[in-house]
Structures are given as C-alpha cells and as structure tokens.
C-alpha cells in the first residue's frame, strides 16, 4: 500500500480521535491495548450497513463514532505506517506523525469548525445527507484513494518533495477543507434537486481532495527533519495531557508505559 494512502488514513483517525475527545471527554470508547506486534483488522463493512439511520438526528459525536467504527485504531495505524513504508526513513516518519500530534489542538479546532458548520445546515436537511454519506463510509474509500492519487501526481508535477510526509504534516488543514468541500457539494446537489446526493458526492470527491490539497502542498514549507523525535513517546505524553493517565494507559501496553517512565527519569 502506498505511503500517501496510509498517511491519509492516519490523519483521518488522528483528527476524528481529537474531535471525539474535544466534544465528549467522558465518552466511553473501547480501546484495545497495543501489543508489540499489533494486527490491523480489515474494516467491518457490516458495521456501516447496520448503523441506524437515526444517527443523522444525533450529535456530532454520533457522526464521529460512525467514522471510528470503520477505521483502524490510531496506534495500529501509526505502527502500520512504520512497518509498511519503504523509501522513507524511520526518523522522518516519527517526526511528521509527532508533528501532527503536537498540532492536536489545531486539529480539534479545524474539525470542530468544519463539522459545526455542517451541523448548522441541519434545518434544510443537509446535515442528514452528509451524515448518511459518512455512515456509508466503505463506499467512499475508492474515491478517496483516487483523490489521493491525483494529489500525489499533481504534487510530483509541481516539484513537491517528501509528498507523503507533507500530506500528513498538512493534514489538519486538508481534513477541514475536504469536509468543507463535501458540505458545499451536498448543498449544491440539493439546490439542483439531485436524486442521489451520495452519488454526486462520490463523483466529485476525488476532485475535492485534489483541489484542496494541491495549493496547500505546493505552497507548504519544506519538510523539516528531526532525528531525535520519538513518535510513541510524544503520543503517550499528549494522551496523558488530553485524556488523563488512566485512559492513556488503556491505549498502550505496560511495557510502553514503563519505557516512558524510564525516559522521564533519565531526563530528570
């Protein structure tokens, strides 16, 4: 699997996780302990098929839950990136993912703003259509992959270096802009009295992703390498700061926690 596709999946999970924490700190989301060699399960298509359509009438938390039910756990995604990528140095991958983690407050604001904007259109039914599209996430995977591939090809043409790494580094803005683009597409489809709004969204999704990504990647500063960055350590630290040590402990193994404690003592 190409780095850019895995990177986008990771960015999607990071953003969704951040928004969940922001909207409902007490939200009891099941977390599996990440072992030394985690296995990433295939998304369960039946989950999306069985989601009650009444989710469209619930809060933003419901939308994000539908997303999280269809993507791997955040720890497994990051581990998969590290194991599956060829041609990218480990320290580069650590650095860029840690950069996204460090920008978590901005990710929360970006996703929160985009989804709140969508929710504000609920009175004309737009929010229901956006929600139903997200619930049917498995159908959206192929257009997303196409959009990512278009983005990569355009970035190559424009001479962007470290394309995959830059996609992740700029993920907060990209996620926000893509959600905004989908919202506008739904609104336009309703104005045009389109019979199948989801089909309209799927048709335009590759272009939406490519359009919002091209200018961002073309104008983004060169990727900065930091060989001293350790992804897992930063992730655990940020988790403790955000959701507390007990919840953070549920997301990682005891060995990882022990390593982090040892690191703190070494730095003291």
Swiss-Prot record:
Range of residues in the leader sequence: 1-18
Gene Ontology MF: a single term: toxin activity
Stimuli inducing this protein: Expression is not markedly induced by human epithelial cells.
Subcellular localization(s) per the UniProt record: Secreted
Principal subcellular localisation of the protein: secreted
Annotated keywords: Cleavage on pair of basic residues, Host cell membrane, Host membrane, Membrane, Secreted, Signal, Toxin
Domain of life: Eukaryota
Transmembrane spans: none
GO cellular component terms, semicolon-separated: extracellular region; host cell plasma membrane; membrane
GO biological process: symbiont-mediated cytolysis of host cell
Function, in words: Secreted protein cleaved by KEX2 in 8 similar peptides (ECE1-I to ECE1-VIII). Stimulates biofilm formation.
Domain notes: The N-terminal alpha-helix of peptide ECE1-III allows insertion of the toxin into host epithelial cells membranes.
Protein name stated in the entry: Extent of cell elongation protein 1
